[in-house]
């Protein structure tokens, strides 16, 4: 898209339905070779399906992260998606946790940041938005990630970050 390249900003495509937005996203991804995200609409129901609403929230967070990081060339959304406000950039950046091997971060401080960002502490990580703690090891399943990660500490120094299979709870290799 020449317009996106000229402005340096992602394009926003509005569609009349979620189905149309999904199809448009797939078509644009094929045309542009990737870099297209779907911003889903929140479902408004009288009963709350917690799992479904969390998944939509995670997909909205992923789309926002891609826009703010410059990874999105285009965003496709049903018009209903724009009826709900997004988190302000400052709040999003404040709740984003970036870690690298060698960082010095007290484990307790990381746990507090995860809780403040809306993660739930569990015995075992099974899904997005969860984390668990065992000694100097923290497993986290980020909202916008394809898999969980295992963060190992030696005292307060981050020693390794590895992908984790949530089914077996085994680490799969360094990231």
Placement of each model-derived feature along the sequence:
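ASCE RecA-like P-loop NTPase motor cores
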Residues: 1-175
């Amino acid at each position: 898209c020449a317009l996106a390249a000229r402005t340096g900003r992602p394009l926003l495509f509005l569609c009349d339905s979620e189905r149309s937005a999904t199809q448009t996203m797939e078509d644009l991804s094929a045309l542009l070779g990737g870099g297209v995200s779907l911003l889903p609409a929140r479902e408004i129901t009288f009963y709350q399906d917690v799992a479904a609403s969390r998944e939509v929230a995670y997909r909205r967070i992923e789309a926002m992260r891609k826009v703010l990081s410059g990874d999105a060339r285009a965003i496709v959304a049903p018009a209903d998606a724009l009826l709900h406000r997004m988190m302000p950039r400052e709040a999003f950046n404040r709740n984003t946790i970036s870690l690298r091997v060698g960082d010095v971060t007290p484990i307790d401080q990381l746990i507090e940041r995860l809780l403040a960002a809306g993660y739930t502490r569990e015995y075992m990580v099974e899904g997005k938005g969860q984390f668990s703690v065992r000694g100097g090891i923290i497993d986290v399943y980020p909202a916008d990630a394809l898999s969980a990660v295992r963060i190992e500490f030696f005292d307060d120094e981050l020693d390794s970050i590895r992908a984790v299979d949530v089914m077996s709870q085994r680490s799969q290799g360094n990231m």
